[in-house]
């Protein structure tokens, strides 16, 4: 059972870049592992570090700024998560500590993979995202509240409603991944299997 997502208040980091692809999120050389942990160390590796080994932080990259350490909400531009399909991208984001990504648009496969991994992708209009960038950049260290139950982002004194598929919202709020969804029908599955002839079990 995955962690339930009802509401989250967290530090916001503004990544002012459009078309951030999955190879930028987690470069291909770090995809060998099949567990979901450990990828956060390599998140945005080519941007966060000056060396391939990830030992020399790039002081010019926003995630390395002291005021954004511990950020759990990523603010980005349009078409976030484009490029090749890799579930490692949301793995890296969640392992780093992100709970929410806010952007005007997402690549379709990344969008779906995010829900499967309890990372909430919030789509807002470009105008709303522009306002949030201005607010976050003028107030380093600001926290936003993302209320999935009410489907609203609260930032400063403004509220930004967002739309989300009802089924995906239900799964996020109840901590249901694909396994959890199946287990909701465990009794029915067991009853069906018990009706089958012994040679089919």
Swiss-Prot record:
It is an enzyme of class 4 (lyase). Keywords: Amino-acid biosynthesis, Branched-chain amino acid biosynthesis, Leucine biosynthesis, Lyase. Signal peptide: none annotated. The keyword Cell inner membrane does not apply. Pathway: Amino-acid biosynthesis; L-leucine biosynthesis; L-leucine from 3-methyl-2-oxobutanoate: step 2/4. It comes from the Bacteria. One of its GO terms (cellular component) is 3-isopropylmalate dehydratase complex. Transmembrane segments: none annotated. GO terms for molecular function: 3-isopropylmalate dehydratase activity. InterPro entries: 3-IsopropMal_deHydase_ssu, Aconitase/3IPM_dehydase_swvl, AconitaseA/IPMdHydase_ssu_swvl, IPMI_Swivel, LeuD. Its EC number is 4.2.1.33. It catalyses: (2R,3S)-3-isopropylmalate = (2S)-2-isopropylmalate. GO terms for biological process: L-leucine biosynthetic process. Catalyzes the isomerization between 2-isopropylmalate and 3-isopropylmalate, via the formation of 2-isopropylmaleate. This is 3-isopropylmalate dehydratase small subunit. The lineage of its organism: Bacteria, Pseudomonadati, Pseudomonadota, Gammaproteobacteria, Enterobacterales.
